Amino acid sequence: MTMLLDGGPQFPGLGVGSFGAPRHHEMPNREPAGMGLNPFGDSTHAAAAAAAAAAFKLSPAAAHDLSSGQSSAFTPQGSGYANALGHHHHHHHHHHHTSQVPSYGGAASAAFNSTREFLFRQRSSGLSEAASGGGQHGLFAGSASSLHAPAGIPEPPSYLLFPGLHEQGAGHPSPTGHVDNNQVHLGLRGELFGRADPYRPVASPRTDPYAAGAQFPNYSPMNMNMGVNVAAHHGPGAFFRYMRQPIKQELSCKWIDEAQLSRPKKSCDRTFSTMHELVTHVTMEHVGGPEQNNHVCYWEECPREGKSFKAKYKLVNHIRVHTGEKPFPCPFPGCGKIFARSENLKIHKRTHTGEKPFKCEFEGCDRRFANSSDRKKHMHVHTSDKPYICKVCDKSYTHPSSLRKHMKVHESQGSDSSPAASSGYESSTPPAIASANSKDTTKTPSAVQTSTSHNPGLPPNFNEWYV
């Protein structure tokens, strides 16, 4: 990490005196001052810092001295800190094993060849505090406070880059700074300030994606101002303003009170935010209690048109058609189906269990069914009853599904003059006969019927009488 300090007598406690006149060196690895060397875009201070800068870099082994309590004013962050935060600029780290700065040129080259992370900027306002001594955590306290916002904006303690270092130095505050909100602010003229955060952190329902830093107990992940786990100090941010908010569902009661004298009669039109509130309202205020004898649905545009039910529970089940209430979900995982009546749920669960309790009562038939209605439809096969009659051609069928298939033939005839062209509909005519009709259109209908009855290779059309 690069730390550019103002060369001058303002750091006597750090053991650094004044430097000589600045020398101009060729620095090919550095961008111009206006290209991001100074995060504040101040070319004057950037030029001064670039001209009279000093870099301090110790042995990489000193990166681990912080945990053992050894005092060090400047600790290299190239080995421990960069590896903890996932930096891969290994080609920039040149290990200069020196305990002091031998010359300005060597220090400047070491500074400009290392990673650019921290820039010390001369504060124009100036602070009255002077650096009288160098504590172990004095510099890192100033570095850690670099992510706080400018004056007048509250700064959460979660912005600390090195919370472990502050915990270690809590009992030994730096004599060169002051403590504010558990943060030790360095009282130097070159105290580091980060770029002001223009975005407020927002709440996130997910866990911390930077949990990889847990393996480094003394370091916390960088970019803590990205809005993860710091939302406890701020309200919802600007990011959620652009997220699509869920549309508030309003359920309206369309029950018409028959006691109204006005014409036309108006519906209730009370709105509710949940289905439970709507159902409770209809049951308590419109359907009535056990004393109610008239079980009639007065919902707007109800197709029953005032026809009464024999029992109250039947009226309640019917009202679910209007309200859309389905209080009986399938308990089997992954199914997700819901039903308005418990009887339908009971029948549906047999599709999961494979239970078929209804056996065909005809002797010699082993067919079983999941519900009694399917068994009743099947019984027409044995009795030769055909209660399902076509209203167009008076044909009758033993099963309603056969009648539905037959009705598609009439639908195809309405769209196409040829019955063979089914237009995607399934007809009751066998495919072989349909293909014969399409190939030979000169045959009369009687000839087709004769060929059908005398063709031993064609099976009978079982779809007409059995499903």
From Swiss-Prot:
UniProt feature, compositional bias: Basic residues:
86-98
Q: Name one GO biological process term.
A: embryonic pattern specification
Swapping K326M leads to an effect described as: Does not increase its cytoplasmic localization
Stored SMART domains: ZnF_C2H2
Result of altering R341A: Increases its cytoplasmic localization. Does not interact with KPNA1 and KPNA6 and increases strongly its cytoplasmic localization
Q: What is its main location?
A: nucleus
Polar residues: compositionally biased ranges: 67-80, 435-455
Q: What is this protein called?
A: Zinc finger protein ZIC 3
Q: What's the source species for this entry?
A: Homo sapiens
